[in-house]
From Swiss-Prot:
It is found in: Membrane. May be involved in the translocation of tetra- and pentapeptides across the cellular membrane in an energy-dependent manner. It holds the Pfam family OPT. The keyword Magnesium does not apply. The chain crosses the membrane at residues 42-62, 66-86, 115-135, 147-167, 209-229, 244-264, 281-301, 357-377, 413-433, 442-462, 531-551, 596-616, 644-664, 677-697. This is Oligopeptide transporter 8. Belongs to the oligopeptide OPT transporter (TC 2.A.67.1) family. It comes from Arabidopsis thaliana. GO terms for cellular component: membrane. One of its GO terms (molecular function) is oligopeptide transmembrane transporter activity.
Length: 733
């Protein structure tokens, strides 16, 4: 294609070697500045992809298996549409002779148009984290939160990161040492989709394979999505003895250990861990080891030793309980000002968690410290060299950055700072004008910004060189939980501003590096990022608000009909976190007044574990597998449980092992050609059928009542086993 063969005139660009070997092997050192970028096709396909992915991902977010449809689906799907538009759209110019002159069809569909469309799609595929705030307040706390402040919070949390991206782009994008490994997958896919495709021995192109996969997965999802929902979670062990609590605990894929449980549903497989087809085998192996260690060693051991009164509660649950084993009525300990009612809390008693939930919180602590120490121990020397090269006065400019600076105008820093200033002003306005609904004081917004400013370059260097990014959610919850306790909405707003603004800035920086690799004009990339983010936020907010009005008892598992998919597991965990860190506070949970203070030792364990692996690799250099142990991945594997359950892991691991090991090893050519295309087709087909089923049948409550839609068949998996505990629907020992 023209984009990859028309080189700039300076011969040194062909001779200069990229600092990172992977970049040298993957990214072309060529550019065609005349290639179409901002076109009618780009706007139509980009905004359509952004809105569609935003709607689908928010739609799935409230479901039991919240499938995330990645931008890869759109990245592949728009190729034939783009080529079709290049053939059929008129080529005449509109408003010719004016500054607004444009043509709907500037020629062949270009790679640069495709990259910008994918940037729009990235905005739609990345969840708007602040929708959790809307769900927690309106659906769980049953309190008032108007649409305007909710929308403003969503917009500001998503866009605030532009400020940090502008401040640190010189250090985290321009240097060759900052190579952002995940972008190389995107670059490879762009090249595969645009460079001339030789006929394969299977007689089918990537686009044809994508269409076949999409139609097949679309048709198949009619079974697990409507006609035969038991395929979502097949827990056959429970069928042997459905009234035995022990058998139910062992066999339930949704509320137990999930031994032998599996799902024949793509949304079950890919909902929490992402597509198993995109996971490297070493990462899948670490996830498998972590899952088996936590689920089949630590959890049974803690439960049957009755640690933290484990038998009084379900073996697996993300809910909160009182000491007697009944579900905690959080609304009963909130006063009229939406703060903790201390007297009511003293009468109700402390908040209790299932031991599994407590352990996974500990694993979250450990993952944070392990991520930092793993990178320092295993990548410290290279990291220091790369950081000095990036932040030093004599930093060497990357060859691709040289090409960009030669051919295109930079984005002025004041563009980024203007967005930051406007955002900060809006945030202060929200904090003051909507104080009773948001609770966050203005100084809390500034503190959240300071945390994000401090951690963005640190985490950014780690992410740009190792593809690992420790989250800030626990740190932010801890800080505001002590600084401004007993205010749940303030806690989750602070967490979102501190954590998500940093996370978003890393996304923006990653996209800027992708633009450098693919030679997208920086100002055009900036425009696509800003517009895509705003469109995505509006689409996410509108979809969430519509679903709240459309679905009766959304997220309320006590009132939803049996087998309902609208259980909102992710929002439930977010709500519980707001209770633990915000309403009750870390001091009453993990501090000197809390029952779970020993969980803090996980911070220490997470810091020590990478050092032990490093020592083992030095003591036994011939054991190559030791160096493949990645502690943050291993112990962080189950940090998403809950809301993820055992069946999500067992099903995912099987698929990851098949495609990441067997197919990759023994059918490498097929894997290279079709693996990511298969993943994108499965995402898209499942997503489209799910929405169609809802609009055509489930919205009108048209259901089929038969045993295939009666759930997994583990009715007592959530029952306690302690003596004398009375829970509705459970036997008393």
């Amino acid at each position: 294609m023209k984009d990859f063969t028309d080189t700039i005139s300076e011969s040194e660009c062909d001779d200069e070697i990229s600092i990172v070997p992977q970049v040298e092997l993957t990214v072309p050192k060529t550019d065609d500045p005349t290639s179409p970028t901002v076109t009618f096709r780009m706007w139509v396909l980009g905004i359509t992809a952004c809105v569609l992915l935003s709607f689908l991902n928010q739609f799935f977010w409230y479901r039991t298996n919240p499938l995330t449809i990645s931008s890869v689906s759109a990245q592949i799907a728009v190729v034939p549409i783009g080529h079709l538009m290049a053939k059929v759209l008129p080529t005449r110019r509109f408003f010719e002779g004016t500054r607004w002159s444009f043509t709907m069809n500037p020629g062949p569909f270009s790679t640069k148009e495709h990259v910008l469309i994918t940037v729009f799609a990235n905005s739609g595929s990345g969840a708007v984290y602040a929708t959790h705030i809307l769900s927690a307040v309106k659906l769980y706390y049953k309190r008032r939160l108007d649409f305007l402040p909710a929308l403003l919070v969503m917009i500001t949390t998503q866009v605030l990161g532009f400020g940090w991206a502008g401040l640190y782009r010189k250090h985290l994008v321009e240097p060759g040492e900052m190579w952002w490994p995940s972008n190389l997958v995107q670059v490879s896919l762009f090249r595969a989709l645009h460079e001339k495709e030789n006929k394969s021995k299977w007689g089918i192109s990537r686009n044809q394979f994508f269409v076949i996969t999409l139609i097949t997965s679309f048709s198949y999802y009619l079974l697990p999505g409507y006609l035969f929902t038991v395929l979502t979670t097949v827990s056959w062990l429970c069928w042997i003895s459905p009234k035995s609590i022990l058998v139910n605990q062992l066999g339930s894929g949704s509320a137990g250990l999930g031994i032998g449980s599996f799902g024949l549903d793509w949304s079950t497989i890919a909902s929490y861990l992402g597509s198993p087809l995109a996971s490297p085998f070493f990462a899948s192996a670490n996830i498998a080891a972590g899952f088996f260690l936590v689920m089949y060693v630590i959890t049974p051991l803690c439960y049957y030793l009755d640690l933290y009164n484990a038998k009084t509660f379900p073996i697996y649950s993300g809910k909160l309980f009182v000491a007697s084993g009944k579900e905690y009525k959080v609304t009963s300990i909130i006063d009229a000002n939406f703060r903790l009612d201390r007297q009511a809390y003293a009468e109700t008693g402390p908040v209790h968690m299932s031991t599994f939930f407590a352990v996974t919180y500990g694993l979250g602590f450990a993952t944070l410290s392990a991520s930092i120490f793993h990178v320092l121990i295993f990548n410290g020397k290279d990291l220091w060299t790369q950081t000095r090269g990036a932040f030093g006065k004599n930093k060497k400019m990357d060859i691709h950055t040289k090409i960009m600076k030669r051919n295109y105008k930079e984005v002025p820093l004041w563009w980024f700072l203007s967005i930051f200033a406007v955002n900060l002003a809006v945030i202060v306005f929200i904090c003051i004008y909507y104080k009773t609904q948001i609770q966050l004081p203005w100084w809390g917004a500034f503190l959240a910004c300071l945390i994000a400013i401090f951690f963005t370059p640190l985490v950014g260097v780690i992410m740009a060189t190792t593809n690992q990014a420790p989250g800030l959610n626990i740190i932010t919850e801890y800080i505001i939980g002590y600084a401004y306790p007993e205010r749940p909405v303030a806690n989750i707003c602070f967490k979102t501003y501190g954590y998500i603004s940093m996370s978003q800035s890393l996304t923006f920086l990653s996209d800027l590096k992708l633009g450098t690799y693919m030679k997208i004009p920086p100002r055009t990339m900036f425009m696509a990022q800003v517009v895509g983010t705003l469109v995505a936020v509006i689409a996410y907010a509108g979809t969430a608000w519509w679903l709240m009005a459309e679905i009766p008892n959304l997220c309320d598992t006590n009132l939803l009909p049996p087998g309902s998919q609208w259980t909102c597991p992710s929002d439930r965990v977010f709500f519980d976190a707001s209770v633990i860190w915000g309403l009750v506070g870390p001091r009453r949970m993990f501090g000197d007044l809390g029952e779970y203070s020993n969980i803090n030792w996980f911070f220490v364990g997470g810091a020590i574990a990478p050092a032990l692996v490093y020592l083992a690799s030095r003591l036994f250099p011939n054991k190559k597998w030791i160096s493949d142990i990645h502690i943050p991945v291993l112990i962080g594997a189950t940090a998403i449980m809950p809301p993820a359950s055992a069946v999500n892991f067992t099903s995912w691991l099987v698929m990851a092992f098949v495609f990441g090991h067997f197919v990759f090893k023994y059918r490498r050519e097929w894997w290279q050609r079709y693996n990511y295309v298969l993943s994108g087709g499965m995402d898209a087909g499942t997503g489209f059928m799910s929405v169609l089923l809802f609009l055509a049948l489930q919205r009108s409550e048209i259901a089929i009542d038969w045993w295939g839609n009666s759930g997994e068949g583990c009715p007592v998996a959530k029952c306690p086993t302690a003596k004398g505990v009375v829970v509705h629907g459970c036997p008393v020992f």
